[in-house]
Curated annotation (Swiss-Prot):
InterPro entries: 4_helix_cytokine-like_core, Interferon_alpha/beta/delta. Its main location: secreted. The keyword Secreted applies. The keyword Nucleotide-binding does not apply. It comes from the Eukaryota. It comes from Bos taurus. One of its GO terms (cellular component) is extracellular space. GO terms for molecular function: cytokine activity; type I interferon receptor binding. Coiled coil: none annotated. Disulfide bonds join C24-C122, C52-C162. This is Interferon alpha-A. It is found in: Secreted. One of its GO terms (biological process) is defense response to virus.
Length: 189
């Protein structure tokens, strides 16, 4: 899982750097929304991560699949949008653990939906300026495959509480990195 984590960190660094340098500036509230998503994801935890160590998995989120350093800055916001969209869909599935607090899950979905709205506004503005979609097909396919692997993993594990804990932790690390990096770039500006 270490290679996946390091790649996610690299991707989010590129994404946050790009977001800070695009003509479309996401409001400070976007960083606060990331923190809210993190808080809600943390509150959803019902299983001790240490009891799920045998269920950990490497979801193969490869740097080459998304173009790595080849990813243009303007495309990073598209990647972030696609990741947020798939996260929303993942946590909207019927297989969500019954042990999760429904009101927390609803709040998480609402927070993700607000982020999608903010990101979509930036995408629309950037695509209008450039006249073409920002996300390369390879990047889009890599994100879809990654989330497909998460979904298959949940199905293979029959949506067990430990499987959801592994997926929840994977998503939480991504949002944590995103929040920290956005704030560090904001301080530099």
């Amino acid at each position: 899982m270490a290679p996946a984590w390091s790649f996610l960190l690299s991707l989010l660094l590129l994404s946050c750097n790009a977001i800070c340098s695009l003509g479309c500036h996401l409001p400070h509230t976007h960083s606060l929304a990331n923190r809210r998503v993190l808080m809600l994801l943390q509150q959803l935890r019902r299983v001790s991560p240490s009891s799920c160590l045998q269920d950990r998995n490497d979801f193969e989120f490869l740097q080459e699949a998304l173009g790595g350093s080849q990813l243009q800055k303007a495309q990073a916001i598209s990647v972030l949008h696609e990741v947020t969209q798939h996260t929303f869909q993942l946590f909207s599935t019927e297989g969500s653990p019954a042990t999760w607090d429904k009101s927390l899950l609803d709040k998480l979905r609402a927070a993700l939906d607000q982020q999608l709205t903010d990101l979509q506004a930036c995408l629309t503005q950037e695509e209008g300026l450039r006249g073409a979609p920002l996300l390369k097909e390879d990047s889009s396919l890599a994100v879809r495959k990654y989330f497909h692997r998460l979904t298959l993993y949940l199905q293979e594990k029959r949506h067990s509480p430990c499987a959801w804990e592994v997926v929840r932790a994977e998503v939480m690390r991504a949002f944590s990195s995103s929040t920290n990096l956005q704030e560090s770039f904001r301080r530099k500006d």
